[in-house]
Amino acid sequence: MQQTDLKTRNQLEHLNPKGAYAELGNLLRLRFAAKDLRLFAPRAVKSQLNGAERTRFRGRGMDFEEVRLYQAGDDVRSIDWRVTARTQVPHTKLYREERERPVYIFVDQRASLFFGSQHCFKSVLATHIGSNIAWAALNNGDRIGGLVFGDNNQRDIKPRRSKHAVLELLHQLHEFNHQLNSPIASPDAKTLVSVLSDARRIAKPGCALFIVSDFHDYDQFCEQQLFELARHTDVTLIHVFDPLEQALKSNARLSVSDGVNRLQLPTDNADFQQAYENAFNDHVGFLSNSAKRLGITLLSYATVDNLQLMLRERFAAKK
């Protein structure tokens, strides 16, 4: 058993993101890994807007669930006459019905993600996360749509329940990823708040919305947009980052450049290192507290993480 688990783990690690650019073949191969992922757990339905998960309804459905005492309002066609005759008390059959829930996947491919100090760039990590979610949604029979956005353009993928929708998303991820060539954005680059505003137009009520980004420009205006989104959609934020953004440890000064100007940073100074670390923690703390206030899920993955293993820990299908 341990040998099998080790073999599976090694196979999954082979699918983890690597390098500065995403490879389409690797994104396609994630289909085999995503078969073990389940995005949604079964729960009782609250309204007709719920979908993409197994929900409980009175009356005829897909799968037989259980028999219980007849209640006022039950469909008489669902009465279990055998149990009723045996007990002399009316009983009703309950069924489970598969309710559709479109899944929208928004993936950030702006310049700020074109960075990585180990294993892979943030932009590559984001493409792998988005691809895993898309394949998992397809395996669950959901409609898949989304948006891939860069600094100056974006591509909307209309929701469809087919492999073609996933393939379109993967091709757009690959195309946008390979357009990146610098971590420095132009002054008129697309902002996250504008993308979230578009999300309110694109994502339909009752859908599940996954947003993959480094959220470097997340602010109170973004929170306002998310507040409106979260009223009608099930939002999950997926934050990607690199360890070098989290902490900067160096015994020597480092030089940075935007391609025109060059600046030397006192990275060997303890006060500078602490201020650098505090800036990252403060921003992530604001993002985390914002998600809590809105009642939405926030997940974080680093470029050095074993992504496939961590996705299974979060979205493991129940055997």
Describe each PLM feature range.
Residues Q2-R56, L69-D74, V83, T92-H128, ...:
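Exposed, interaction-prone extracellular/peripheral surfaces
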Residues R77-T87:
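N-terminal low-complexity, intrinsically disordered segments
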Residues E66:
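Acidic, metal-associated active-site segment
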